[in-house]
Amino acid sequence: MSKLPLRDRLVVLTRPEGRGADWKDALVEAGAVVSELPLLEIKFEPDDTVLSEVLDAMGEYDWVVFTSANGVRGFFDRFFERFTDIRSVGGVRFACLGPATEKALRQYHLDSDLTATQNDALSLGRELMTKHDVENQKLLVVTGNLNTPELPRLLADGAMAIVDVIKVYATEEKSVAESPEAAEFRRRGADAIVFASPSAVESFLHQAASLRPDAGARQPKAVAIGATTADALRKAGIPLAGTASAPTAKAIRDAVVAALA
């Protein structure tokens, strides 16, 4: 691999604003010109009644399970509106889905007791059940509005755990048709466009008419962050050029390099 395998390549990231800075850094270090087209936005809107009940019961939980970095941020932002001392979490243990979630947890000076080796919620549940006895233990699953109920169901039915669920954020489509970023994308196109979730793929499809590169512009190759997003691209009929082996900046950079080789 040359020192700058992405020299002068234009790569578009579709993550929400303020997310994926390490992805951008890794791509820029490889020589890419990176632009952002945030197809989604994150809103932190937990149900206040449910959240109050959860915080009242913090000392009762054996595990808190986070499915995303957004879940970590959304939960602790509200946690510190109630408490001033991180020790108020009690003796709870933490499980995280993926390295980005683990990294977000460490920002609160907390370590993950279990981080899933694969980037899907059911793998996290199976690892938790296999490596720890959670039968009759009380678990809190912190998640968002688009997550399926499969993980809580697995833990409740498969591990016989007592499971509470709180949704602390919502992922919503962001209209970018009139944005400067969309105008630039139409004018220049891109060599690659990176999708980080099925919902980003869906948002792209809904806005496809306003995101079509002009004649003569570069036609981007689609790169997925993982298998679930790759499946969403295939189902949408978007040719898949590459899939990252893990949801990390290095793996995403390597997938883009391979797709454009």
Each model region followed by its residue ranges:
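Signature of uroporphyrinogen-III synthase
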Residues: 1-261
